[in-house]
A protein has these predicted regions:
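Charged phosphate-binding loop/patch that engages nucleotide di/tri-phosphates or the phosphate backbone
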Residues: 1, 117-130
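A transmembrane-helix-recognition feature enriched in membrane-embedded lipid enzymes
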Residues: 2-37, 85-97
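A structural signal for well-ordered alpha-helical segments within the folded catalytic domains
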Residues: 12, 16-19, 72, 105, ...
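Membrane-interface alpha-helices
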Residues: 32-45, 102-118
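Active-site scaffold of zinc-dependent metalloenzymes
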Residues: 40-68
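Post-HEXXH active-site segment of zinc metalloproteases
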Residues: 51-52, 84-113, 123-128
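Active-site recognition of the HExxH zinc-binding catalytic motif
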Residues: 72-84
Length: 130
């Protein structure tokens, strides 16, 4: 029996590289800010708001944003990059099926809702003075 693996496979890796090429072309076309390699991502800043979703979009190994490129957010986006590598071109389909609400989207939950800016960071309660 021939079994075709679609995740963590040469097929998904090809999809990841295709998405990275598309993300790179889109970022190169529209970015007006610095283009940097940070946390394993090609980060395109200065993008017009209509060229990406929410605070930024990870497409393959590229992160597209206007200026939302802090270290915490890039850690979140690095998880999305790993998801692109695992699922390849299945990732955008699976992401849409998971839903647009980040609080219920398994991919956003895996990447970290706090790091992605979807929920406020919890503050530690202050201890009463003795």
């Amino acid at each position: 029996m021939l079994r075709i693996r679609l995740t963590d496979s040469p097929i998904s890796l090809a999809g990841y590289w295709w998405a990275t090429l598309v993300g790179f072309a889109w970022g190169f076309l529209w970015s007006t800010g610095p283009i940097e390699l940070r946390q394993g991502l090609i980060v395109f800043t200065g993008m017009p708001k209509w060229t990406f979703g929410r605070g930024g979009s990870c497409v393959g190994g590229c992160y597209l944003t206007d200026r939302n490129a802090g270290d915490v957010v890039l850690g979140h986006e690095a998880v999305h990059k790993a998801q692109w590598r695992r699922y390849g071109m299945l990732f955008p389909v699976l992401y849409l099926i998971a839903g647009r609400n980040p609080l219920g989207n398994r991919f956003e939950i895996e990447a970290g809702l706090e790091a992605g800016g979807y929920v406020l960071r919890r503050r530690r309660p202050e201890r009463p003075a003795r």
